[in-house]
Amino acid sequence: MSKIIGIDLGTTNSAVAVLEGTESKIIPNPEGNRTTPSVVAFKNGEIIVGDAAKRQAVTNPETIISIKSKMGTSEKVSANGKEYTPQEISAMILQNLKATAESYLGEKVEKAVITVPAYFNDAQRQATKDAGKIAGLEVERIVNEPTAAALAYGLDKTDKDEKILVFDLGGGTFDVSILELGDGVFDVLATAGNNKLGGDDFDQKIIDWMVAEFKKENGIDLGQDKMALQRLKDAAEKAKKDLSGVTTTQISLPFITAGAAGPLHLEMALTRAKFDELTHDLVEATRQPVRQALSDAGLSTSDIDEVLLVGGSTRIPAVVELVRHETNKEPNKSVNPDEVVAMGAAIQGGVITGDVKDVVLLDVTPLSLGIETMGGVFTKLIDRNTTIPTSKSQVFSTAADNQPAVDIHVLQGERPMAADNKTLGRFQLTDIPAAPRGIPQIEVTFDIDKNGIVSVKAKDLGTQKEQTIVIKSNSGLSDEEIDKMMKDAEANADADAKRKEEVDTRNEADALVFQTEKTLKDLEGKVEEAEVKKAEDAKEELKKALEGEDIDDIKAKSEALSEIAQNLAVKLYEQANAAQGEASEATDAQEGPKDANTFDGDFEESK
């Protein structure tokens, strides 16, 4: 069975891993980095992903960051003269990671396990699966990020019974999960979190502070300057990282804008104390989910054996301090917070292929599921933190006499009123025989698969008529749309490969021109003029071809020059060998014939 790669599709950074033997390994990208920025840019019709896209973000307004925060919504982003769904942009990142894995493994990769925040709702999970499909990946499993982290941590500890708390603060999302590990079973007991809280919010606090301070000093609002804002974002991210290791950092942005008197520079010092003050509300927002998860699991802090920190934002000292305070434990530092999720996803891939034995993963649904009933009430069928996959049925009836149809309004959330929860979908069961209200028996069944994706069935027990839907949110893509996007993605991949081939061909041709010029210089006066002219003409033909766009012409001219250059090189070597032979003969002639009584030998000096 072919390898199943593990992918951590993050808000700010992503990572890809693979199981080698019994060990999960992060695959470095072509730049040698173990994580890849989740950044996509468009330039002259070309798609740029990762480190290269992030490097040019300051000067390129067609750069898209933090697309994960839009997954599961109908929001689109405009770039490259068209509109893209979050799934399409995410697919470009996934394609990049897929190519990295294929280059490393030396084989095609078609299957992946992709992680999502534990608190992702159905729409966000479905969108992630669609992104994988567009990227040409069969998504074997969607795994919650904290669960994947626990897998990576606990794979070699399956003989122990432990309860662990995973505190996962990434670039754009926050989750807390409580898991029980024992006999190879990874059982998620509870999960809580916030899909709108992460490292990006910490960056934004620094940006807002810099904008306010600069306006106070210079009367200019940098918040209105798109290019300045991108420079501020980069500086804020760097300052945040610096303050994890030092207590003060200098922010220096020369020529940030221009005033009436000329260019203006931004020079500010940010202390850790000030940073803690600016971000106090964000750190505090992580406290309640920790308590909620413990409460839902029916545990106290003394029951927790280990605390794992996941996500780059858990390096912030104030966050670490809050975790210490809430759990009365020193967080475990044995896992790399940036890499552990992808590694866990690769392990789950190994479980699916059978390479990892005796490991069972029992995940949970993060939010309650149910339907709207009379009076706009939210009636739950499946409570949050129920182990998945699962199925639950309940019988309902009509609200009016002779009601011919019922509307099934499917919801996800925790609020008592339907209007306050997230709509997953609506469908109708029709042709209900006329009867007084309360008589028809309508059975509603919820199914949640191992990926946390929901399907709902309504059945009239009298007529046995039923209606089923797999939940598609308002951002859900039809199969036709996904197929079209897959073809577009493949076309882009082909175009990228063609572009790379063109660049390689041009580079090789340039090198050949340079090498030929060097060879001709070395052969000056040593070969016939006709041969030199033949090489000169072929070289000029290739240089002329390089000025055009016809790659086939460049290839043909390169081959012609290469053949001539090889013949010249052979002549150069022949001449060098001939000269060496002549020199050797001349030396022998100078030494004269040896005396018959003379012989060569070694001697030792006697002492």
Curated annotation (Swiss-Prot):
Which residues are connected by disulfide bridges in this protein?
none
Q: What induces its synthesis?
A: By stress conditions e.g. heat shock.
* Sites of Phosphothreonine modification: 173
Question: Could you list the residue ranges forming a coiled coil in this record?
Answer: none
Q: Which PROSITE patterns match?
A: HSP70_1 (PS00297), HSP70_2 (PS00329), HSP70_3 (PS01036)
Q: Where is this region: Disordered?
A: 577-607
Q: Report keywords, A-Z.
A: ATP-binding, Chaperone, Nucleotide-binding, Phosphoprotein, Stress response
Q: What does this protein do?
A: Acts as a chaperone.
Matches recorded under PANTHER family: HEAT SHOCK PROTEIN 70KDA
Q: Which family does it belong to?
A: Belongs to the heat shock protein 70 family.
NCBIfam families linked to this entry: PRK00290.1, prok_dnaK
**Could you identify this protein by its name?**
Chaperone protein DnaK
UniProt organism field: Lactococcus lactis subsp. cremoris (strain MG1363)
